[in-house]
UniProtKB/Swiss-Prot annotation:
<dbReference type="GO" id="GO:0006412">
    <property type="term" value="P:translation"/>
</dbReference>
<dbReference type="GO" id="GO:0005737">
    <property type="term" value="C:cytoplasm"/>
</dbReference>
<protein>
    <recommendedName>
        <fullName>Small ribosomal subunit protein bS16</fullName>
    </recommendedName>
</protein>
<dbReference type="GO" id="GO:0003735">
    <property type="term" value="F:structural constituent of ribosome"/>
</dbReference>
<dbReference type="InterPro" id="IPR000307">
    <property type="entry name" value="Ribosomal_bS16"/>
</dbReference>
<comment type="similarity">
    <text>Belongs to the bacterial ribosomal protein bS16 family.</text>
</comment>
<dbReference type="InterPro" id="IPR020592">
    <property type="entry name" value="Ribosomal_bS16_CS"/>
</dbReference>
<keyword id="KW-0689">Ribosomal protein</keyword>
<dbReference type="GO" id="GO:0015935">
    <property type="term" value="C:small ribosomal subunit"/>
</dbReference>
<dbReference type="Pfam" id="PF00886">
    <property type="entry name" value="Ribosomal_S16"/>
</dbReference>
<dbReference type="InterPro" id="IPR023803">
    <property type="entry name" value="Ribosomal_bS16_dom_sf"/>
</dbReference>
<keyword id="KW-0687">Ribonucleoprotein</keyword>
């Protein structure tokens, strides 16, 4: 099953997440099909907190990809920010 989920990066105590489309059988930070954005929960000042390619997300959801709970919330927030 294909899922859209967070892959953790960054240093210890300084998380940074890539939003990726991956096969659910692969490891959290392992092989992925496509990177569709990023989420930086510790962004300060003018730094971007969230960047998401909504066209690609909609494409993957239309082809049957499931989203994790956190990614579904981030997609909702991104759509609200665009509108």
């Amino acid at each position: 099953m294909v899922t859209i989920r967070l892959a953790r990066g960054g240093a210890k105590k300084r998380p940074f997440y890539n939003i990726v489309v991956a096969d659910s059988r692969n490891a959290r930070d392992g092989r992925f099909i496509e990177r569709v954005g990023f989420f930086n929960p510790l962004a300060r000042g003018q730094e971007e907190t969230l960047r998401l390619d909504l066209d690609r997300v909609e494409h993957w959801v239309a082809t049957g990809a499931a989203t994790s709970e956190r990614v579904a919330k981030l997609i909702k927030d991104a759509r609200k920010a665009v509108a």
